[in-house]
Design a protein with these regions (language model features):
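Nucleotide and nucleotide-moiety/phosphate-recognizing core
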Residues: 2-159, 167-188, 199-209
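Regulatory input/activation interfaces that engage signals or partners
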Residues: 192
Length: 210
């Protein structure tokens, strides 16, 4: 566990491709999708919260503090990241924040360790995950000192692109290996976008999780 690193799970999306609603509450292997994400991320951080809008009571079973966006207009993942940075700065003793999408049940159990190792010795830098040469901007380690710059970027510049904000600052990409799964391999950042993805995740679950 990295006690000086807080974590936030991003679950504020509208899930249009899944017919609306909270896809993180869909059942996977007998428990909510969110439960798998929490089980993998919680042991890696000192404090963990959930970024989601609407009635927080629907996430009560997760045991997490639920943080609504601090900017209006459903501004996407960057709004959740900003909310997480501001929460961590005022409610924890942590120095940085790791973010993860709430629809990725197989996220790396060494996500924080690898991102933190890459960022070590580079004060103020963002460490962002990648796999198979593809960047995953919502899986990143963010210095809390970037929160004012992010609020300006999101609110004053009205720019919602996560990668665009990352590229404006010093950053390092961290390549994560594929996971072994039933004789094959799967991207650890595999996410649930449509019903077929959920069916695939069900088949993969037993071969990936210990």
């Amino acid at each position: 566990m990295s006690r000086d690193i807080a974590g936030i799970i991003l679950a504020g999306g509208l899930s249009r491709r899944m017919g609306g609603g909270d896809k993180t509450l869909l059942a996977l292997g007998g428990r909510p999708l969110l439960g798998h994400v929490v089980a993998r991320l919680a042991p890696q951080v000192g404090s963990l919260a959930l970024s989601a809008n609407g009635d927080p009571a629907r996430f009560a079973a997760s045991g997490l503090s639920v943080l609504a966006d601090t900017v209006e207009g459903h501004a996407g993942p960057l709004a959740g990241i900003l909310t997480g940075l501001e929460w961590a700065a005022t409610n924890t003793a942590c120095k940085s924040l790791v973010t993860a999408a709430g629809d990725t049940p197989f996220l790396p159990v060494d996500l924080v360790a690898m991102l933190a190792s890459a960022a070590a010795g580079r004060p103020g830098s963002i460490a962002v995950a990648s796999s198979s040469g593809r960047r995953h901007p919502t899986f990143a380690l963010w210095p809390l000192g970037l929160r004012q710059a992010l609020r300006h970027f999101l609110v004053d510049e009205d720019n919602r692109r996560v990668s665009a904000f990352i590229e404006r600052h010093d950053f390092v990409e961290v390549e994560f290996p594929l996971l072994a799964a039933g004789g094959g391999q799967v991207d650890p950042f595999f996410n649930i976008n449509v019903a077929d993805d959920l069916a695939v995740a069900e088949r993969l679950l037993q071969s990936i999780e210990p």
